[in-house]
Design a protein with these regions (language model features):
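Short, Lys/Arg-enriched N-terminal segments with co-localized hydrophobic residues
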Residues: 1-5
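Conserved catalytic-core segment of NTP-binding enzymes
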Residues: 163-176, 192-273
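Short, flexible active-site loops
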Residues: 184-190
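Generic, low-specificity signal for short hydrophobic/alpha-helical stretches with a mild N-terminal bias
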Residues: 7, 37-40, 185, 219, ...
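Conserved Walker B
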Residues: 134-135, 187, 225, 251
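Surface-exposed, interaction-prone regions with an acidic/low-complexity signature
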Residues: 8-14, 241
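Primarily NTPase-proximal linker/entry elements flanking Walker-type ATP/GTP-binding cores
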Residues: 12, 16-134, 139-175, 179-184
Length: 273
């Protein structure tokens, strides 16, 4: 049930992303689907970034010709639902939790961290935001402003340029204040940057080795406009730390968003927000 709700919410979230899916189902409503229609459907599915493998699966279902238009649409929906059958809603439980937000430059990490803080604060959690992007002063200032708007605590060590040290201080502070949830905003980094990826690995080691009382959740921000390149990024980040979920950003500026399917199909990373 959650998977179906999640798929519908993403398809219906924004008009740009919804349009191609609606066009596909409109074509599928025809009594007879021509070879030209199949080519059009294939083109529209590829444009949503659903991926060539999944597009080919859907085209195969259409070519089988075993269903009338209504059953065909339902079977395609069921096929997509089945692909995400292991998809689970992100659960922040009662014990202390730290969410580490990672991703490439400009993918929306800082805004995502702020939105998560608002979401969980509204749900009754005591939240601390930690600014571990020590390279970009604007990110620190932005997160500080968001923390004031949300009404949660904000941690940044202006005397340290070491992100892992900032995270250490943030978690120690959260323990002292008995906060439920720590959200860490990390610096944007290309998955090809070896030194920055090692830095991310160090952050994870600090959390896992020094703060085992915290449940660690790693979320990767995915810029919906980047398409299939997001799969490459997520795969490389996953080599540093296991990704528990993805946050799909910038859907308002693209007709894409179908990347959620190959993201889970290939890497088993669910889109949680």
């Amino acid at each position: 049930q959650y998977v179906l709700i999640m798929i519908n919410s993403i398809i219906n979230a924004l008009s740009n992303s919804r349009s191609n899916f609606l066009k596909v189902f409109h074509v599928l409503s025809k009594n007879k689907i021509s070879s030209q229609d199949i080519e059009l459907i294939e083109e529209m599915l590829v444009e949503t970034d659903i991926g060539y493998d999944i597009t080919n699966d859907i085209i195969d279902i259409i070519k089988e010709g075993l269903y009338d238009s209504s059953d065909l649409k339902n079977n395609i929906k069921l096929h997509l639902v089945k692909m995400l059958s292991g998809h689970q809603e992100l659960s922040v439980k009662e014990e202390k939790t730290v969410i580490v937000v990672v991703g490439v430059n400009g993918s929306g990490k800082t805004t995502t961290a702020a939105k998560l803080a608002k979401f969980y604060s509204t749900a009754g959690k005591k939240v601390t935001l930690v600014a571990a992007d020590t390279y970009r002063a604007a990110a620190v200032e932005q997160l500080k402003i968001w923390s004031e708007r949300v009404g949660c605590r904000f941690i940044f060590n202006e005397n340290s340029t070491e992100p892992a040290s900032v995270v250490f201080n943030g978690l120690e502070s959260a323990i002292a204040k008995d906060d439920d949830l720590v959200i860490v905003d990390t610096a944007g980094r290309l998955h090809t940057s070896e030194n920055l990826m090692k830095e991310l690995a160090k952050i994870n080691r600090v959390i896992e080795n020094r703060f085992s009382q915290f449940t660690k959740i790693s979320l990767i921000t995915i810029d919906a406009s980047l398409g299939q390149n997001s799969i490459v990024q997520a795969r490389e980040f996953g080599k540093i730390c296991s990704m528990d979920g993805a946050v799909l950003t910038k859907l308002d500026g693209t007709a894409k968003g179908g990347v959620i399917f190959p993201l889970y199909d290939q890497l088993k990373i669910p889109v949680t927000f």
